[in-house]
């Protein structure tokens, strides 16, 4: 029996589902295996992590962009169509995940049988439950020698409230149990519901930029139908476009005449900018537009800012072009030019979170062959002045110096940490050091614990995750989401060299930590900056008050070398002359900070973390 054609598929045979899993629990491998078993992928063209198209995705083993694949699967003589929507698993991309979940009716909760449930799995599971999806619990990697299937099955059953026997066991690597899983999807996931003759409404759950064809928009049709060559309207921007190509992905793009209720596919309109087709927006017919959008659209909001500067100043235009190109593929990326007296021309770039920042930087360096320096990541602070005005500070150099400051507000996040119970003490200690407020602590099983903390985002962006991993031998996992703002006692610490502030090294820190930050930074720069002909003071200051100082000793010539014996007044004359020369040099001399010193000092201030 041949598979139904796109555009004329009965919604009753469609099943839309996604896979929720923590990094490394085998989501992409399971997706590969499903593609092979349903015959969409033949053995010859199969490669590991078939759906992860970016090199970085394959190398790091993570999924950054969502993908959607249509697979036929026959049950009792009826060919069903399974649309698998592959979602990113990382906390930075939780908005993308929530949009992908909106496009589904069911979700596979995939858990590694050796490791058990992790924080991101749990966070995405809650998103799926909020979206009212049918959850199918699955244990993966049952072929591993270290798999503890029964224990983790009980854990999952306890969290989602099902019976242990309902937890399916598969091995994505060998293919064991995957056919049963496909049957279960057909049996359990509800068919999509929608009104076929209503005005079209389709949810955009991802958009990617293709160099040759412009933006490819992935959509899930909720009501009505979208047809080839008709005019469509984006409801959040009001922009109208013509559909140049429409089709499904199986697993390469297959053009079709249209898409109907419940179907998942792609559109190409010839638009060149991803910001024109925003994730979470609703697409409708321009001729007969829908009254109401599907709701839930949010504009992605950067949480973390960092300055990116080319090491070689002549690469600045290339960096601009590279960011322009990346933004075509990543609507959440925002940037504006900035200049630094120390680092020259560059950009202030806003990211969704730390992983997003790392990936963008790595893609700039790898795909565009740029050498970059990035300044320490900072968050957006709101400074309320006594005259009632508010200043948003994304860069320490924007911190107001004149006028009286009433209060400074900083973003906070609710963090969930899952860890083996033996590490509770060290995790609580870390969270307390980072100004956290404990919100709750629950045992998921006798030896796994869920710790909830409210933390300032600025305390997480540096190296919280690395510290957490090193304190728990890599077993703890972290998930966080924003929770508004709070007032805090924050100050701007300036680093002065020979009395001049170095803008790239300024930082906004909590008053309690300002002293240790200043001392550590001054000590670090003392090691890094080469000795000059004159004495150079390295100072850390809050406003006009110096809180720490180190002195880089001058290099001096031995002016007494030519005096054999001789009179003391002769020696004193030579020393006084040298001293006067050094003093004059200090007034006119400027200190050049070598680039290596910057890179080392900005390396997220490791020495400031010495416990």
Curated annotation (Swiss-Prot):
Keywords of this entry: Cell membrane, GTP-binding, Hydrolase, Membrane, Nucleotide-binding, Protein biosynthesis
GO molecular function: any one?
translation elongation factor activity
What topology does it adopt in the membrane?
Peripheral membrane protein
The main place the protein resides is: membrane
> Could you name the domain of life of the organism this protein comes from?
Bacteria
- Reply yes or no: does the keyword Hydrolase apply: yes
Q: Name one Pfam family in it.
A: EFG_C
Q: Which HAMAP family match?
A: LepA
Q: Where's it found, cell-wise?
A: Cell membrane
Q: Does the entry feature the keyword Disulfide bond, yes or no?
A: no
Q: Where does GTP bind?
A: 24-29, 140-143
In the record, biological process GO terms are:
positive regulation of translation
What EC number(s) would the UniProt record show? 3.6.5.n1
Originating species: Cutibacterium acnes (strain DSM 16379 / KPA171202) (Propionibacterium acnes)
Among SMART domains, the record links this protein to: EFG_C
What reaction does this catalyse? GTP + H2O = GDP + phosphate + H(+)
Q: Might you report a single GO cellular component term?
A: plasma membrane
Descriptive protein name: Elongation factor 4
Instruction: Say which family it is in.
Output: Belongs to the TRAFAC class translation factor GTPase superfamily. Classic translation factor GTPase family. LepA subfamily.
């Amino acid at each position: 029996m041949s598979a139904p054609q796109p555009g004329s598929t009965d919604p009753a045979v469609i099943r839309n589902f996604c896979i929720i899993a923590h990094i490394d629990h085998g989501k992409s491998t399971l997706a590969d295996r499903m593609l092979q078993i349903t015959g969409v992928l033949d053995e010859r063209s199969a490669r590991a992590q078939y759906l992860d198209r970016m090199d970085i995705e394959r190398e790091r083993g993570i999924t950054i962009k969502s993908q959607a694949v249509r697979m036929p699967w026959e049950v009792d003589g009826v060919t069903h169509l399974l649309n698998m929507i592959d979602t990113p698993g990382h906390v930075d991309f939780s908005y993308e995940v929530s949009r992908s979940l909106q496009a589904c009716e069911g979700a596979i909760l995939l858990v590694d049988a050796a490791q058990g449930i992790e924080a991101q799995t749990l966070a995405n599971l809650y998103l799926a439950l909020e979206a009212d999806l049918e959850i199918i619990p699955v244990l993966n990697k049952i072929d591993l020698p270290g798999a503890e299937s029964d224990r983790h099955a009980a854990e999952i059953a306890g969290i989602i409230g099902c019976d242990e026997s309902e937890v399916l066991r598969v091995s994505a690597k060998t293919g064991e149990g995957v056919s049963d899983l496909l049957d279960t999807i057909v049996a359990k996931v509800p068919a999509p519901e929608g009104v076929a003759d209503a005005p079209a409404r389709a949810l955009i759950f991802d958009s990617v930029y293709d160099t040759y064809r412009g933006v490819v928009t992935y959509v899930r049709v909720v009501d009505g139908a979208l047809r080839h060559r008709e005019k469509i309207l984006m409801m959040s921007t009001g922009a109208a476009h013509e559909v140049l190509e429409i089709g499904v992905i199986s697993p390469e793009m297959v053009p079709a005449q249209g898409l109907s209720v419940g179907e998942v596919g792609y559109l190409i309109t010839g638009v060149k900018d991803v910001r024109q087709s925003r994730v979470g927006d609703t697409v409708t017919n321009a001729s007969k537009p829908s009254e109401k959008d599907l709701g839930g659209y949010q504009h992605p909001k950067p949480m973390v800012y960092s300055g990116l500067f080319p090491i070689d100043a002549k690469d600045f235009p290339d960096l601009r072009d590279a960011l322009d190109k990346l933004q075509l593929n990543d609507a959440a990326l925002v940037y504006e030019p900035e200049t630094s007296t120390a680092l020259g021309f560059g950009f202030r770039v806003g990211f969704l979170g730390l992983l997003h920042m790392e990936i963008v930087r790595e893609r700039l360096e790898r795909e565009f062959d740029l050498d970059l320096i990035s300044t320490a990541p900072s968050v957006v602070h709101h400074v309320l002045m006594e005259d009632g005005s508010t200043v948003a500070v994304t860069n320490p150099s924007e911190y107001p110096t004149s006028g009286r400051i009433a209060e400074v507000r900083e973003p906070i996040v609710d963090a969930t940490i899952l860890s083996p119970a033996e590490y509770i003490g060290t995790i609580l200690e870390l969270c307390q050091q980072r100004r956290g407020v404990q919100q709750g602590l629950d045992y998921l099983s006798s030896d796994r614990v869920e710790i909830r903390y409210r933390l300032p985002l600025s305390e997480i962006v540096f190296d919280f995750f690395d510290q957490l991993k090193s304190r728990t031998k890599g077993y703890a996992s972290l998930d966080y989401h924003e929770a508004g703002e709070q007032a805090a006692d924050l100050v701007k610490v300036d680093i002065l060299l020979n009395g001049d502030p170095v803008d790239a090294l300024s930082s906004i820190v909590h008053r309690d930590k300002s002293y240790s930050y200043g001392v550590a930074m001054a000590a670090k720069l003392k090691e890094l900056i080469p000795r000059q002909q004159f004495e150079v003071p390295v100072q850390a200051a809050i406003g006009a008050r110096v809180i720490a100082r180190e002195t880089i000793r001058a290099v001096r010539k031995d002016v007494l070398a030519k005096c054999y014996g001789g009179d003391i007044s002769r020696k004193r004359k030579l020393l006084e002359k040298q001293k006067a020369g050094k003093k004059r040099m200090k007034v006119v001399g400027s200190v050049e900070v070598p680039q290596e010193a910057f890179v080392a000092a900005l390396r997220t201030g490791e020495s400031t973390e010495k416990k």
